[in-house]
Amino acid sequence: NCLNFGNPEKGKVMGQFVETIDGISQACTYLDFPVVSGNVSFYNETQNKAISPTPTIGGVGLIKNLNLMMTKNLKEIGSYIFVVGKTSGHLDQSEFFREVLKIYEGPSPEINLFNEKNNGKAIQKLILSKLVNSVHDISTGGILLTLSEMCIAGKIGAKIKVPQDNVGPHEYLFGEDQSRYLIEVNEKSKDKTCN
């Protein structure tokens, strides 16, 4: 674990550091997630310009039954892939904005600890109930990159149907809303999983 920041003698940088510590503290308390060690690195600057605040936290968990360990690779041709969590299509600060459109502004996606905990518990329940073949968290790159990683790992392709609701196709496929997962479900588990 490491927290990397610029010069703490500058008010903006110290403010970023304080807000980061506060956010980590809130998340660890709410999610009952211990951070057992850490390092802080200050004065990370180039030509008197600070790096972006870069907190890095590694997590370790216990898997009670290795036979239920979940991986991201798609397992079965003809299975269904569902999104768990709300998709609002947040593109600000996304890989799509930065890498494709060269837009480097806007707020980061909102983090809702209640949704994070509840969606995580729902995924855990699906895994323990043996209702899913594979699971992958949706993060950098949104649904499309996450699904690509699952397809490549499983050497299986996928067809995507973008819902016709209030989120456009780019927002749906590349949005980086938090607390979401892609799950692979086979035909016999589909009805139980969706209830």
Regions found by a protein language model. Give the residues of each.
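Internal, well-ordered alpha-helical scaffold/interface segments
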Residues: 121-124, 145
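Glycine-/charge-enriched secondary-structure boundary and capping motifs
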Residues: 13-27, 31, 36, 40-56, ...
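Hydrophobic side chains in well-ordered alpha-helices
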Residues: 119-122, 192-193
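Mobile "lid/hinge" segments at catalytic clefts and subdomain interfaces of large enzymes
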Residues: 1-7, 13, 17, 25, ...
